[in-house]
Regions:
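Structural alpha/beta surface segment adjacent to cysteine/selenocysteine redox centers
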Residues: 2-87, 164-165
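C-terminal cap of thioredoxin/glutaredoxin-like
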Residues: 19-22, 82-170
């Protein structure tokens, strides 16, 4: 199954859960073609710092962008690393194979957030392909069962512009 779109993200726990779900479906054979875009909805210093670092890597080292994002997400959520600490940026850069010091790019975060808001993004994680955006939050049960079928359901809702809101209590 091919799954594509633009994912608006920050460094929140719900984005980490969604990222882990996507990693799991990728291991099951899904062809993921996702463009990860910064979205700063709240006054969250951790997300603001992390997003500014990732945007700098996107601009200056686009081929290492994904590896750097993955490293920062893991450092934040597996090691509770402080994304405002330059040592965290250095560790993520090393993990991503970057020798440069990463200078934050907060203006790019602002531009990406404004782009997302114009599309209707109000929180993260949100996917945009065409038409209305789809906010997707998964719980730990998302990693069990038929993951590709679950991804197919998400894809079907994303494609159906007649569905605007589906909610199921967590």
């Amino acid at each position: 199954m091919r799954f594509e779109g633009r994912v608006y993200y920050d460094f929140s726990p719900q984005v980490w859960r969604f990222y882990r779900f996507l990693a799991a479906v990728g291991k099951k054979g899904a062809d993921l073609r996702l463009d990860w875009r910064s979205f700063l909805a709240d006054d969250d210093p951790q997300s603001a710092a992390g997003l500014a670092l990732v945007e700098s890597v996107r601009r200056n080292h686009p081929d290492r962008h994904g590896a750097f994002l993955q490293a920062l997400l893991a450092l934040r959520h597996l090691e509770d690393a402080d994304l405002t600490d330059p040592r965290t940026a250095a560790a993520a850069a090393e993990a991503a194979g970057l020798a440069d010091v990463i200078e934050p790019s907060p203006d790019a975060v602002t531009a990406s957030t404004e782009e997302g808001r114009a599309l209707g993004v109000t929180g993260t994680p949100t996917i945009h392909r065409h038409g209305p955006v789809l906010r997707v939050e998964v719980n730990p049960a998302a990693y069990e069962g038929d993951l590709l079928e679950r991804l197919s359901r998400i894809d079907a809702v994303l494609e159906d512009d007649g569905i605007w809101v589906l909610e199921k209590p967590g």
